[in-house]
Amino acid sequence: MSRIHPTAIVEPGAQLDESVEVGPYAVIGAHVTIGARTTVGSHSVIEGHTTLGEDNRIGHYASVGGRPQDMKYKDEPTRLVIGNRNTIREFTTIHTGTMQDAGVTTLGDDNWIMAYVHIGHDCHVGSNVILSSNAQMAGHVTIGDHAIVGGMSGVHQFVRIGAHSMLGGASALVQDIPPFVIAAGNKAEPHGINVEGLRRRGFSPDAISALRAAYRVLYKNGLSLEEAKVQLRELATAGGDGDAPVQTLLAFVEASQRGIIR
């Protein structure tokens, strides 16, 4: 049987695995599904059409699955889907999607979401992401796997943050950060390749060297973006461990709608 504090409210229709723990004064809505071994802290609210996987930890006073902060929202049954083993700390807010997008906000697995983070409607957060305290994601933001967003940072709507990238604290990000790149500032500017993060994740020296060369092409050689793309295509087929990550970088740049930080 689920371990639910007597002061918690679990609305009829909610589906909780028998191993779920719900703390004092928490509220679980009627359309919520919570997987095994997940814990919900005191005074937290999980509402809307929200699904949580297994082994998640929801901190005190978190608000998960709330209505989108979008004036076009008309009570459609949009969703929030959260994977497994995520930590979502105190006072975090995560909203469901809107019909103007795909109707769903998603978080992957093994994410570390610190206190007072906001994840807006229609955001898509990958896996193994760190969002530091007070980081604020506007609607429709996409964050790749293993990315880090520093505390007190603001991210504009529709911005993409590439895998393995890092945004420094107190930054304002209005354009896309390519994968593997460090950015910081108001407004955020590029500051090199996330070498230490790549080493920790097992990238080979050859792969890191190739990404450093790609960074020079993109940011240091005085090339236009179109000229840089031509040279990146050559680097991406040079042979060796560097091909795959450079191809990932190039594909991200080519797909950018808002433009990349420059």
UniProtKB/Swiss-Prot annotation:
Protein localization: Cytoplasm
Domain of life: Bacteria
Main location: cytoplasm
SUPFAM superfamilies (alphabetical): Trimeric LpxA-like enzymes (SSF51161)
Top-tier EC class: transferase
Protein's pathway: Glycolipid biosynthesis; lipid IV(A) biosynthesis; lipid IV(A) from (3R)-3-hydroxytetradecanoyl-[acyl-carrier-protein] and UDP-N-acetyl-alpha-D-glucosamine: step 1/6
EC number of this enzyme: 2.3.1.129
InterPro entries given in the database record: Acetyltransf_C, Acetyltransf_C_sf, Hexapep, Lipid_A_LpxA, Trimer_LpxA-like_sf
A GO term for molecular function: acyl-[acyl-carrier-protein]-UDP-N-acetylglucosamine O-acyltransferase activity
A Pfam family of this chain: Hexapep
Keywords on record: Acyltransferase, Cytoplasm, Lipid A biosynthesis, Lipid biosynthesis, Lipid metabolism, Repeat, Transferase
Family (UniProt): Belongs to the transferase hexapeptide repeat family. LpxA subfamily.
Subunit field text: Homotrimer.
Primary role: Involved in the biosynthesis of lipid A, a phosphorylated glycolipid that anchors the lipopolysaccharide to the outer membrane of the cell.
Protein name per its UniProtKB record: Acyl-[acyl-carrier-protein]--UDP-N-acetylglucosamine O-acyltransferase
Gene that specifies this protein: lpxA
